Amino acid sequence: MLCILILLLHPRLCPVTKGGLGKPSGDIYTALFGAPCDCKGGTQTNNYATPTYTQVTDCGDKNAYLTYDTNWNGVSSPKWLCVRKPPSIPVINGRPGPCPSECTNNIKSQMHSSCYSSFSQCTQGNNTYFTAILQRTKSTSETNPVTSGLQPHGVLQAGCDGTVGKSVCWNQQAPIHVSDGGGPQDAVRELYVQKQIELVIQSQFPKLSYHPLARSKPRGPDIDAQMLDILSATHQALNISNPSLAQNCWLCLNQGTSMPLAFPVNISSFNASQNNCTPSLPFRVQPMPSQVYPCFFKGAQNNSFDIPVGVANFVNCSSSSNHSEALCPGPGQAFVCGNNLAFTALPANWTGSCVLAALLPDIDIISGDDPVPIPTFDYIAGRQKRAVTLIPLLVGLGVSTAVATGTAGLGVAVQSYTKLSHQLINDVQALSSTINDLQDQLDSLAEVVLQNRRGLDLLTAEQGGICLALQERCCFYANKSGIVRDKIKNLQEDLEKRRKALADNLFLTGLNGLLPYLLPFLGPLFAIILFFSFAPWILRRVTALIRDQLNSLLGKPIQIHYHQLATRDLEYGRL
């Protein structure tokens, strides 16, 4: 027992041995394969292709790769192979520099983003292109094809054409219905579509110019009126579909930009002739995985007026209806097209494939009976505590519930409760001061109004007063400022009592505020003291009991009883 206590109290006395399955240190690699920048495996100068490697080290103008080769004997010893970095393209007068010599009269129309590690911009003639070092080749492929009586259509995945390790250049804008896998060409297409939609909106609704003094201020982090309307509508819909849940629930919004949910709907009720919708900029949504639904399709005209909205690849199109005119969705619906972008209206020159979907706000619903998750303190004094990850919000500020969060949770909860109480008192105090200031302004305004009323009555005295002159009912001012001031005074007195009660509470202010933090440790400390106090007495009592039992067993005399045995001679004598 004593050795265990010494080891627990003095952990530094024990030798520490580290082990694991991590990679070896750099010294071991240097001893086995040499310094990386020495390039013992050679320097690759004919191209800039990245070899197969396990580690890479930056050596300034080149990168050192720890490569390995495979042959019929197995894997050879790794070596550091150096590959020189491609020359960077400088920026001259705000424009990218000239393209590499390999790109002369060899500009590609498309390039998949998986075929290069990084890209930059270059200029050739009066045009700007993307350029990169080609790492692999790839052929063009088609995804999500639809053949429902119309011409097959889908999104084409761009290929990679060129020599591996050499520079390639390609256009900034890919051909229509060709995707580079989320690379720069897809980003340029999204910006182009957004700009074209802005032009359509400006042509229908001219932009108003405001005076700088009349320009509205940007909204802060508070919830605006539109979001409150969305929350109200969501609660009304929930009240209709699930009244029991709507009676007591939380409606939770995600932080940051909200992405609505998109559910594909049937187009049986769609009316292609309606054109009373208002276009807006496309916004990103979260399409829900769904089954087969009909799609809207319009082929490309192969001219500069086409607006490629992309191809909806999150749903399998059961059929495809061809439309050559502008389309408007129904109320509460939108067209979801490529890259999960939703359009409230499709212009006449759109091209691509879209799905009609209903939009719902991204709101999480938590029942009022369930606990609302809040963060917990997992690390106290450098040691990780066993704490409940999710605790109720309304009960988590109390003392009893905080015991479940660990030994340190009680002190933190009590201190947090104290700070919250002070904060609430200060907030209510500030609110009462604000109401008092508003009441002063109202009193001043009332005095001005009464003065104006008396002046108007004097001016219209010959006509019987202002009321007869206007042929209206006379209005009189009912001054209730005294009632408001009395309520504010009572509120301030109550706040002062609460502040004094918190200050006089020894449980919260004892030992200069350290008592709430010491209380969690007093229980275990008191238990340890009781254990070491009564353990010797209990040990003595048990030892004495065992000794008495042994003595009583060993002290008893051994009694031997003799009995006369019958012999066979006596039996024969009787005979």
UniProtKB/Swiss-Prot annotation:
All ranges on the Extracellular side of the membrane: 20-517
Known partners and oligomeric status: The mature envelope protein (Env) consists of a trimer of SU-TM heterodimers attached by a labile interchain disulfide bond.
Domain remarks in the Swiss-Prot or TrEMBL record: The YXXL motif is involved in determining the exact site of viral release at the surface of infected mononuclear cells and promotes endocytosis.
Biological process (GO), any one: fusion of virus membrane with host plasma membrane
Glycosylation site residues: 126, 239, 266, 271, 302, 316, 322, 349, 479
This protein's name: Envelope glycoprotein
Membrane-spanning segments: 518-538
SS bond partners: 249-252, 249-475, 467-474
Region (Immunosuppression): 450-466
Motif annotated as CXXC, chain positions: 249-252
Coiled coil ranges: 411-461, 471-507
Family matches, as PANTHER family: ENDOGENOUS RETROVIRUS GROUP S71 MEMBER 1 ENV POLYPROTEIN (PTHR10424:SF75), VIRAL ENVELOPE PROTEIN (PTHR10424)
CX6CC, short sequence motif: residues: 467-475
Fusion peptide: region residues: 390-410
Purpose of the protein: The surface protein (SU) attaches the virus to the host cell by binding to its receptor. This interaction triggers the refolding of the transmembrane protein (TM) and is thought to activate its fusogenic potential by unmasking its fusion peptide. Fusion occurs at the host cell plasma membrane.
Chain span(s) of sequence motif YXXL motif: 562-565
UniProt topological domain (Cytoplasmic) ranges: 539-575
Mod. after translation: Specific enzymatic cleavages in vivo yield mature proteins. Envelope glycoproteins are synthesized as an inactive precursor that is N-glycosylated and processed likely by host cell furin or by a furin-like protease in the Golgi to yield the mature SU and TM proteins. The cleavage site between SU and TM requires the minimal sequence [KR]-X-[KR]-R.
Annotated site (Cleavage): 386-387, 560-561
GO cellular component entries: host cell plasma membrane; membrane; viral envelope; virion membrane
InterPro entries named in the record: TLV/ENV_coat_polyprotein
